[in-house]
Regions:
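C-terminal substrate-binding/catalytic lobe of Rossmann-fold NAD(P)-dependent oxidoreductases
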Residues: 45-100
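A general structural signal for well-ordered alpha-helical segments in protein cores
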Residues: 24-25, 102, 127
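Conserved S-adenosyl-L-methionine
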Residues: 35-44
Length: 152
């Protein structure tokens, strides 16, 4: 379980937003542009959620390591993870393809094909901001999965 290792320790990994979110935020900024506004709706040990106003998109995001928050239709097919983004009403599910991702990335870094500070700054700044913001609850443009945890 993630809470037993350093990954679930806020002081060691930065928590959910830093540990697993940084990659997602990096992808979002690469596709949709820089973060213009950053709001946090939910912060618990096993889930974080918020919303971004990016240069070219508005995004509601939800991250969790809790299997109970995965949609029932995803659990029904035996899937243990769920990664999805909906753009203009069309869902793109991208849960697969992450096997050995870190190992492959580290090999590329050792070959000199890593990323510099300029490429990493936006994502690191985003997670730092999230870590320092207070959660506002079910206000504004929150992700619908927040209702699995919070009550109006």
């Amino acid at each position: 379980m993630v809470f037993i290792s350093w990954k679930g320790d806020q002081a060691k990994s930065g928590g959910i937003a830093s540990n697993i979110g940084v990659h997602f935020y990096d992808m979002l900024c690469w596709i949709f542009g820089d973060v213009k506004e950053n709001v946090v709706h939910l912060k618990t040990a096993d889930a974080n959620a918020g919303s971004f106003r990016l240069k070219n998109a508005n995004v509601r995001w939800f991250l969790s390591v809790n299997y109970n928050y995965i949609p029932n239709e995803v659990k029904a097919i035996g899937q243990r993870t769920y990664r999805s983004i909906t753009v203009d009403g069309e869902e793109i599910e991208f849960s697969g393809g992450f096997t050995d991702l870190h190992t492959r990335s580290y090999k590329e870094i050792l070959k000199g094909n890593g990323f510099g500070l300029d490429e990493a700054y936006g994502s690191i700044n985003t997670v730092s901001t999230i870590r320092n913001l207070d959660a506002i609850g079910l206000k504004g443009e929150y992700h619908p999965f927040c209702k699995k945890i919070l009550k109006s």
